[in-house]
């Protein structure tokens, strides 16, 4: 009886979200409701919210995240895969490549949110094909390097800073890379990883 009375006396807050409600308001409310129990990852929230805006860009991200070479090199845990970390890494790369590496938001997650929202609102088929071709070509190059630790700091753990540096460098220099043999590229990456300034940046990021 005591518990029943407590339940009856506990206020229940109701939030009404209309279809025409401002998008950011709906997104913020969804994030706030995602508390207690096992919360969703940021990418899982994006997958729920932004598909309601336009599902095509999320489907494009999911397609790239299924790339066999990409998954073999990144090689995350099952739990992280379930939290859509492959998709988050693809979105991270596309955001930094297409929107730049400098951002005014509090953190890169907010920056990625803004980028994904903009792509959903202004879907560009031509840009999609360009990004897809480039991503696939980068993966083919990485496969030829035969380095399963390429995104790792030493041989210890995957680091997003190493991932960002290598993915963005390859995407910005693809034309030059076509004339560079794989052995030379591997040596250049190895030299980069041994650079003290680079390691200082990667280790602190």
Residue ranges and their predicted role:
Residues 1-113, 179, 183-191, 197-204:
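Basic- and aromatic-enriched surface patches that contact anionic nucleotides/nucleic acids
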Residues 24, 85-88, 133, 137, ...:
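Generic recognition of stable, solvent-exposed alpha-helical segments in well-folded globular domains
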Residues 48-66, 121-140:
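An acidic intrinsically disordered interaction segment
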Residues 62-79, 135-153:
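Short amphipathic alpha-helical segments and their helix-coil junctions
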Residues 79-83, 128, 156:
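Conserved phosphate/pyrophosphate-binding and hydrolysis machinery centered on Walker-type P-loop NTPases
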Residues 105-139, 145-151, 155, 162:
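Small-residue-rich helix-loop
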Residues 143-197:
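C-terminal hydrophobic structural anchor segments
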């Amino acid at each position: 009886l005591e518990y029943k009375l407590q339940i009856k006396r506990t206020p229940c807050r109701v939030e009404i979200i209309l279809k025409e409600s401002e998008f950011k308001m709906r997104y913020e409310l969804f994030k706030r409701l995602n508390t207690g129990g096992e919360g969703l990852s940021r990418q899982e929230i994006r997958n729920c919210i932004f598909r309601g805006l336009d599902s095509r860009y999320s489907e494009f991200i999911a397609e790239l995240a299924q790339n066999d070479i990409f998954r073999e090199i990144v090689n995350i845990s099952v739990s992280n895969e379930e939290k859509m970390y492959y998709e988050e890494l693809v979105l991270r790369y596309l955001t930094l490549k297409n929107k730049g590496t400098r951002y005014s938001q509090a953190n890169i997650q907010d920056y990625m949110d803004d980028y994904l929202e903009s792509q959903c609102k202004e879907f560009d088929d031509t840009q999609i094909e360009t990004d897809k071709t480039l991503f696939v070509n980068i993966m083919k190059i990485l496969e030829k390097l035969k380095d399963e630790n390429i995104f790792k700091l030493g041989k210890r753990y995957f680091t997003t800073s190493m991932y960002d540096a290598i993915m963005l460098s390859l995407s910005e220099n693809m034309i030059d890379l076509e004339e560079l043999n794989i052995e030379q590229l591997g040596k250049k990456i190895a030299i980069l990883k041994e650079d003290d300034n680079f390691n200082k940046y990667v280790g602190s990021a």
